[in-house]
Design a protein with these regions (language model features):
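Positively charged n-region of N-terminal signal peptides that target proteins for export
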Residues: 1-9
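A residue-level marker of the well-folded mature domains of exported/periplasmic proteins
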Residues: 4, 13, 20-266
């Protein structure tokens, strides 16, 4: 799969913004976790940009989406003498105290994708609400093409706090205003593919016609659930498609990389 060009370009800009610095200085990249393909791709882009700029970028992300681990990563970056931190915050508040301490220590903060409530040098992200609306429109197109003009839609998201995925969900919901579809209460899988699959399987048992995934783990879980369900006709739409083998390929008609939609055959 092609890398997300816009993401790589943003990383170059982020690194430049984070360093009105001399070559050889250190930048910490702290994302929500270190296993989501989105963040792995982000790190790959950061490493390429760092090589061009002559700075060092260290991927210091937690193993899983955990506020305490992310706070520890921020503290370790400050203790390690890093001049800048590029961070995708799990939520707006949890790591704010740690980031404030980093700023007080002279560390520059740059947000990518998901900001916290601490002033930063810059924030780089896609228009997640607009991208979410596009995802909703893609689902409506796919459902209409399948002759489905009403029914329940499930949502599998990460949590109720992460800025980027909350906005994606809001945009997705807005696409269905004035339609005969019914958006069910959101269920949270913490970005974990296995948990998200269980949620999606429950939605399918309830008879939904479509399921939306707010991030890569959610989308992977939805795809696995749709595959396991057989020929149910459930339509899945999600974000941040993985470079890993895709058991849901051909069953997930629209997967979004940042804000750019991609449609696969049904």
């Amino acid at each position: 799969m092609k890398k997300i060009v816009a993401l790589l370009l943003s990383l170059c800009l982020v690194l430049g913004a984070a360093s009105a610095m001399a070559a050889g200085e250190k930048i910490a990249l702290i994302t929500m976790d270190s296993i989501d393909q989105h963040w792995i791709t982000l790190n790959e882009g950061a490493q390429k940009a760092a090589e061009e700029l002559g700075v060092t970028v260290t991927f210091m992300s937690p193993n899983t989406k955990d506020d305490a681990q992310q706070i520890e990563c921020v503290n370790n970056a400050v203790a390690g003498g890093y001049q800048a931190i590029i961070v995708a915050a799990n939520g707006p508040d949890a790591i704010s105290s740690a980031l404030n301490e980093a700023v007080e220590a002279g560390v520059k903060i740059v947000y990518v994708d998901s900001p916290a409530n601490v002033e930063a040098e810059a924030t780089f992200s896609t228009d997640n609400q607009a991208a979410g609306k596009t995802a909703g429109e893609e689902m409506i197109k796919a459902l209409t093409a399948a002759g489905i003009t009403s029914g329940d839609i499930g949502i599998v998201n990460v949590n109720a706090a992460t800025d980027s995925t909350v906005k994606r969900e809001a945009g997705f919901r807005s696409a269905f205003e004035g339609t005969d579809y019914n958006i069910l209460e959101t269920q949270y899988g913490e970005g974990d593919a296995a948990k998200s699959q269980t949620i999606a399987e429950n939605y399918i048992t309830q008879g939904v016609v479509g399921i939306f995934g707010g991030n890569e783990g959610s989308t992977t879980g939805i795809g696995n659930a749709i595959k396991a369900s057989g020929d149910t006709g459930v339509i899945g739409v999600g974000f941040d498609k993985s470079d890993a083998p895709e058991p849901h390929q051909g069953r997930l008609p629209a997967v979004h990389h940042g804000s750019e939609p991609r449609r696969d055959g049904l």
